[in-house]
Amino acid sequence: MDRLFDLAQRAAQLEQAWRSKRLARVGDTSLKLARMDAQAYPDEAHACAEGLLVLDGELHLDVAGVAVTVTAGQLYMVPAGVSHAVRPGSHGTLLVIDA
C-alpha cells in the first residue's frame, strides 16, 4: 500500500479529465484524485457529504442554483443530498473526499 503520494505526478498521469482515481481509503472515506478541464460536468447529488479540495487551478460549481468558485488551497463541502454541477471553465487538480 502506498503511503506517500506525489499528487502532481499522479494527476499528470490521469488519462481523462473528470475521471477520478481512488488513491486511498481512510475508514469509510475515499480519497480520489481528478484532473479538471474547462468542460462542464452534469448535475449530481450524493447520499453522503462530499469534500472538494482544489490542489491547483479553480473549480466553478453550481450548488443548488448558486454559483461557487473554489480556488487552490480551498475545500468546499457539498452537503449530502444537495444538487451540484461543474460549470464551464474549471481547470487544475481536484482531491475528492467522499464515502
Residue ranges and their predicted role:
Residues 27, 55-56, 71-72, 90:
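A cytosolic small-molecule/anion-sensing beta-strand core signal
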Residues 30-46:
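Conserved short histidine dyad/triad with adjacent acidic residue
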Residues 29, 37, 66, 82, ...:
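A generic "binding-loop/recognition-motif" signal
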Residues 80-99:
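Ligand-binding loop in jelly-roll beta-barrel domains
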Residues 1-33:
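A short, N-terminal "cap"/entry segment at the start of jelly-roll beta-barrel domains
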